[in-house]
């Protein structure tokens, strides 16, 4: 029989369920698993992950073979490509969408060139028939998934189609996989759909497959101690790399017997050396240093096996690289070799056994390489498969947050997927804080249907807002843009009692007016009595002309019998007919725009807090209008100002607690982290915040934040004297170091930068 391309791939059948029958007696199944934070974790967390991984290896008995496969593929990131396809909306901003898509493409190239990194564990059992194999594999699968889950690792079992796609993509790097079990003809092998056009294993050090040249090597461990960074360093190479670890446990009593035999051999050698010394007439206690070291190693290994819960494994490590030219291939291999040498190990080409090397690297669970090495659980666990968690949510509402500083993968996330989408953006002046906020706003406008509202105390968002035809509302005593603090709509607050919720806001505002220790119980009662009366006309006939203004409340309070009514009216006077009467008008601005910016830069210091409170209330109006139909994103710059006063602080906490129910996504932005952290309400804010974008921090603030958010020392480096646009992103339970170098030659950059010399 002629030997065909398919004969190289040595399995009998790969079933739809994901079970692969390798030969008469062996069956395997595969699980794909994701990365977790290891490199930047707290020391105790790192130790925990390491021990959990070693225990995970210990859980396999000698009847099971395990293969860990790490596959890095260039240009295979379909998921990433689809995530950056921002669809046009024909709303006048499609030129910016095009620019944003191009920017994302260039970020991928700048990052790791769309390198797809995958991790798999394949487990193989021996069984007499498929039925027996299925029950064994299913039990194992449940155990492996739960072990990985307990380490915080997301993992999922692969079905037949998914396993075939992985094999196809390794063997056909430039082709698209097209296969469905429905189309499989009777007696046709699934191999037909995964093999390349040709295999040529004639050369001794290379092999050809399709249009590519590959090389398989085995990894020789010569070092006495290994680093848990080594595997990560190999996988950091931005090139096509396949690495497989074949691991099989040795029966514990066998392992102990084996080590004891070694110990006996060494003792015999020592006796021989002693006799030699006596015959030659020198001191019999002087032994060759190699023999002493070796003897100590064997004794400590025996102790580990007997008392330290260590197990012995037989491990084979195979590498496979490929490229279109021998020169490119040799470059990558020499890169790998130099990392191996640095760690006192060696990458050795599998001369004349390239075919066996290729088979051993495929995630099938087959090891054709007879070169192995005995390692304990801890030595095997040193090949730690985890480095950094990725944050990549493939959703139509995902926004761009830069590149992962460790893996250089795109960070795409959708805050709406969080339990609490509320957020904070924190950073010192010049850290890129405003820029990050603007980038998120612009991205949200381009990608989602959400409304965006900004409270702008420094007047720095106007450029961006005008770019997107938004409305900039200048709130100041000189401006002719008016906001009525008494505005209400029928959905206001919880919707069932709009006035009750509105009363809360009016009380908060009047507490600011009165100052001191706030309103007395008597004053609150009088206000509460007046409010339904001033809204009567509007509720009977809800037209804009019937909306009450502060003047109506002032008149009503003045007309009350109690002295406190008149006292309150007097205290309100300056805001009604005096020099601070900017809020005593009906609203005359278009609040229905998709993008709204309240510019309060010229609102005097006396009115700033009231201004921020009134804006917050207008946002409530908007959120309650949008409820159920779309999200409302609200950005509050200089957020620490709102948390300084009890009244504005408690109102802000209310927003933080209740907004999400109605589709509101508030974001506080501040450079004054110290002031923010001093607020009594900060615990409530942090407890209800699942998104924190942290840029460079001042040293004192850094320490407080590290305690509050459990940041490890290696993570802290990313917010210590860091460059503009670099920092840490907290997204639910995920912490990712990021960097964002936004291209300066774009329309958006010009509209987002706050550097005077760059604004055109």
Regions found by a protein language model. Name each.
Residues 1-388:
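Extended, folded cores of ATP/NTP-driven motor/assembly subunits in large transport
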Residues 36, 43-62, 73, 233-236, ...:
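P-loop NTPase motor domains
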Residues 425:
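Hydrophobic anchor at the beta1->P-loop junction of P-loop NTPases
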Residues 436:
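Hydrophobic positions on the alpha1 helix immediately C-terminal to the Walker A/P-loop
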Residues 443-453:
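Post-Walker A helix-loop "phosphate-sensing" segment adjacent to the P-loop in P-loop NTPases
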């Amino acid at each position: 029989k002629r030997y065909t391309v398919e004969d190289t791939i040595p399995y009998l059948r790969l079933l739809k369920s994901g079970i692969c029958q390798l030969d008469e007696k062996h069956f395997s199944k595969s699980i794909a698993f994701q990365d977790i934070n290891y490199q930047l974790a707290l020391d105790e967390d790192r130790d925990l992950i390491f021990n959990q991984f070693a225990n995970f290896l210990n859980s396999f008995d000698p009847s099971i073979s395990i293969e860990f496969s790490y596959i890095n593929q260039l240009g295979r990131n379909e998921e990433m490509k689809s995530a950056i396809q921002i669809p046009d909306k024909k709303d006048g901003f499609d030129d910016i969408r095009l620019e944003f898509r191009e920017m994302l493409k260039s970020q991928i190239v700048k990052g790791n060139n769309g390198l797809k990194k995958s991790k798999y564990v394949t487990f193989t059992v021996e069984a007499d028939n498929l039925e027996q194999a299925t029950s064994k594999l299913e039990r194992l699968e449940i155990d492996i998934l739960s072990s990985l889950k307990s380490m915080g690792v997301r993992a999922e079992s692969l079905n037949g189609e998914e396993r075939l796609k992985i094999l196809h993509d390794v063997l056909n790097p430039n082709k698209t996989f097209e296969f469905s079990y429905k189309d499989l003809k009777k007696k046709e092998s699934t191999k037909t759909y995964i093999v390349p056009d040709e295999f040529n294993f004639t050369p001794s050090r290379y092999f050809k497959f399709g249009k590519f040249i590959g090389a398989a090597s085995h990894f020789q461990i010569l070092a006495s101690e290994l680093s848990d960074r080594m595997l990560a360093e190999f996988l950091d190479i931005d090139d096509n790399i396949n690495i497989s670890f074949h691991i099989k446990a040795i029966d514990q009593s066998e392992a102990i017997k084996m080590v004891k035999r070694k110990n006996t051999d060494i003792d015999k050698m020592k006796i021989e050396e002693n006799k030699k010394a006596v015959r030659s007439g020198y001191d019999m206690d002087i032994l060759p240093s190699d023999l002493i070291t070796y003897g100590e190693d064997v004794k400590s290994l025996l102790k580990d096996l007997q008392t330290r819960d260590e197990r012995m494994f037989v491990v084979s490590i195979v590498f496979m690289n490929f490229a279109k030219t021998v020169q490119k291939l040799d470059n990558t291999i020499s890169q790998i070799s130099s990392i191996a040498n640095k760690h006192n190990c060696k990458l050795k080409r599998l001369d004349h056994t390239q075919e066996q090397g290729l088979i051993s690297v495929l995630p099938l669970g087959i090891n054709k390489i007879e070169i192995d090495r005995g390692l304990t659980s801890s030595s095997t666990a040193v090949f730690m498969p985890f480095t950094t968690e990725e944050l990549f949510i493939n959703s139509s509402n995902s926004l761009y947050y830069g590149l992962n500083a460790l893996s250089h993968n795109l960070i795409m996330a959708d805050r709406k997927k969080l339990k609490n989408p509320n957020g904070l953006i924190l950073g010192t002046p010049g850290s890129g804080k405003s820029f990050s906020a603007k980038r998120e706003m612009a991205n949200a406008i381009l990608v989602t249907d959400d409304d965006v509202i900004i409270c702008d105390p420094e007047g720095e968002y106007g450029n961006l807002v005008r770019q997107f035809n938004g409305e900039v509302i200048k709130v100041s005593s000189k401006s002719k843009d008016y906001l009525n603090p008494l505005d209400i709509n029928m959905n206001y607050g919880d919707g069932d009692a709009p006035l009750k919720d509105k009363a809360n806001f009016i009380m908060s505002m009047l507490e600011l007016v009165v100052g001191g220790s706030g309103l007395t119980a008597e004053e609150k009662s009088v206000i509460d009595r007046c409010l339904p009366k001033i809204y009567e006309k509007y509720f009977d006939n809800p037209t804009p002309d019937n909306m009450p203004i502060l003047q109506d409340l002032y008149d009503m309070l003045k007309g009350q019998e109690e002295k406190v009514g008149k006292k309150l009216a007097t205290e309100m006077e300056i805001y009604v007919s005096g020099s601070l009467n900017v809020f005593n008008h009906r609203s005359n601005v278009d609040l229905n725009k998709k993008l709204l910016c309240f510019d309060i830069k010229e609102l005097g210091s006396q009115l700033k807090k009231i201004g921020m409170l009134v804006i917050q209330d207008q946002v409530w109006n908007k959120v309650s209008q949008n409820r159920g139909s779309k999200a409302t994103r609200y950005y509050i710059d200089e957020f620490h100002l709102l948390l300084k006063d009890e009244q504005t602080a408690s109102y802000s906490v209310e927003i933080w607690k209740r907004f999400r129910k109605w589709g509101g996504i508030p974001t506080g932005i501040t450079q004054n982290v110290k002031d923010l952290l001093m607020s009594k309400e900060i615990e409530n804010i942090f407890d209800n915040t699942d998104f924190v974008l942290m840029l460079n921090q001042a040293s004192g603030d850094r320490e407080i934040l590290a305690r509050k958010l459990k940041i490890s020392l290696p993570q802290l480096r990313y917010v210590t004297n860091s460059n503009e646009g670099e920092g840490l992103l907290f997204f639910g339970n995920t912490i990712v170091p990021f960097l964002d170098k936004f291209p300066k030659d774009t329309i958006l950059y010009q509209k987002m930068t706050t550097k005077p010399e760059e604004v055109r």
